[in-house]
Amino acid sequence: MNNQLKYRLNIIWSDEDNCYLVGLPDFPSQTWVTHGDTYQEAFKHGMEVMEELHLAVVNGDIPSPEIITVKPEKVSAQ
């Protein structure tokens, strides 16, 4: 598994589908790309899809997504 991938991966529970759905928002052509019965399974499947999409970018099969960088905000204890 490539730990250097810089894409976002969203995992949500779906009552309708009774499973976790995985989305890759940096790839707008992909909505919900895979799923899993457990959070861990959904994450594993999501990473597999992400690696395949990354290879497609490297090979020039699909355009490179615009990477959105999020800077964490400092939160002070009150």
Describe every region a protein language model picked out.
Residues 7, 18-20, 40:
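Short secondary-structure boundary micro-motifs
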Residues 12-30:
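Short aromatic-glycine-(Arg/Gly/Cys) micro-motifs in beta-strand/loop hairpins
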Residues 26-41:
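A short, exposed loop/beta-hairpin motif centered on an aromatic-Gly-Thr core
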Residues 2-5, 9-12, 23, 36:
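DNA-contacting interfaces and partner/effector-binding or oligomerization modules
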